Amino acid sequence: MAHFNQNFLDSIERDLPSHLSMEDFIAYSNKPLRLSIRVNTLKISTENFIDLMSAKGWSFDPIPWCNQGFWVTISSDLQLGNTIEHLQGLFYIQEASSMLPPTALFDSHADNENDLSQFAQTRVLDMASAPGSKTTQIAALMNNQGLLVANEYSASRVKVLHANVARMGVSNCALTHFDARVFGEYLFETFDSVLLDAPCSGEGTIRKDPDALKNWDNNDNKGIVDTQKALIESAFLALKVGGCLVYSTCALSRQENQDVCHHLKTAFGEAVEFAALTELFPDADKACTEEGFLHVWPQIYDSEGFFVAKIRKVSAVERTLPEPKMQKNFPFTAAKTKQIEELTAYFEDSFAITLPTDAEIMVRDLEFWLFPKAVMPLIGKMRFQRIGIKLADALKKGYKVRHEAILALSSPTRFELSDEQAKEFLMGRDISLVEKVKPQGEVIVSYASNPLGVAKHLGNKLKNNLPRDLVKDKIALYQ
């Protein structure tokens, strides 16, 4: 049972549209959320995923605003986060409403979704990324093309963000760790698209946490609103002319939503154009405000409360701060031609993996990395925590592939494991082989034709090379 205080209910009653009722708001706020997931199309098609999981007792109800999103019913009480398919990165457990902002950001590309190269030169900024649901959704919509800068202010949450980015096989991402208010200064008019899923009071999340609003006080929100206004200004400054900014929160009040967008309009005048989201998906108009924003109340779609606004930058704005000095001592250098040839041959010969040609192979000490080409002009303008994916380490003789490279780069050559073998592998154990054959060296091990990681084939067993931090104590199997 959700715990409301009267101040919160009074605030909701002021902001709730006249065609919606407080009774429904309270009733839906007391209902548990429907379980929802998003298929990761960087690894598996939506159709193949449905076939795979339907055979394991799942049923699917499409989420109307995300082609890869579904409310799901499962026939067991398994912890989905401990299933093999989740650990492989085939899906993300994501609340349905939170799939709206990336959909709004990319809706103009929906008609060209089969053009897999349309984002090759695109730069996208996700200003507040952790834990990574929207970041990985954006990467999938971009088909790992172009550059996705994912920023997170909290140091501990950066680690979670990277873990999810790696699990989902994202390779076009650069991670940063800043107060996002710096982007307008450091990367002025750099990005084609910007997502600001702003820190907020979290009023829309009460269906996840009944105590979320127990001590709600509108006076506590002033500092949050000031931060939101500063962040949306920074986002707009970082946006190219002609680009789109999506501002979203899981708050319900006008103060944190419409008022913040109107603040931007006041600050930048005719350079700001509100883009209507009335036709983003069937029945979107049920949640639309007079400006064309989506103000999703829990009872409209039986989901979390959410707010989404899409804003176009239709003309240039003045840069008020000078361009910062270039940062020095970047620790990476471009790989030499011979190194690239050797590394390319290693991946092709060992794993039948062809390294992408639309990326840069970079070297730091004995490490080889794959950088998105679109990040190269930004080197020195901002400090990055991590760029692209780590491909391999150089040994005295040859190379040793990195786990994240196997998850991100597709290969037709795999050693397929059974349910029980996959469970053993993810628990860090070696896999005994019934038939002794000639040792094959490093091999990609897979489950349901999707990679799990790398093992060393010794003839009579597969020696587990799963990174220790990914070893699980418990794996959930379907009976």
UniProtKB/Swiss-Prot annotation:
Annotated S-adenosyl-L-methionine binding sites: 128-134, 152, 179, 197
Highest taxon of source: Bacteria
CDD domains the UniProt entry points to: AdoMet_MTases
One protein family per Pfam: YebU_pre-PUA_dom
Locations listed in the record: Cytoplasm
Catalysed reactions listed for this entry: cytidine(1407) in 16S rRNA + S-adenosyl-L-methionine = 5-methylcytidine(1407) in 16S rRNA + S-adenosyl-L-homocysteine + H(+)
Recorded GO MF terms: RNA binding; rRNA (cytosine-C5-)-methyltransferase activity
Active site feature: 250
First-listed, main subcellular location of the protein, grouped into a coarse class: cytoplasm
EC nos: 2.1.1.178
GO annotation (BP), single: rRNA base methylation
Family listed: Belongs to the class I-like SAM-binding methyltransferase superfamily. RsmB/NOP family.
Xref: PANTHER family: 28S RRNA (CYTOSINE(4447)-C(5))-METHYLTRANSFERASE-RELATED, NOP2 YEAST -RELATED NOL1/NOP2/FMU SUN DOMAIN-CONTAINING
Function field: Specifically methylates the cytosine at position 1407 (m5C1407) of 16S rRNA.
HAMAP family cross-referenced by the UniProt entry: 16SrRNA_methyltr_F
Protein name: Ribosomal RNA small subunit methyltransferase F
Organism: Shewanella halifaxensis (strain HAW-EB4)
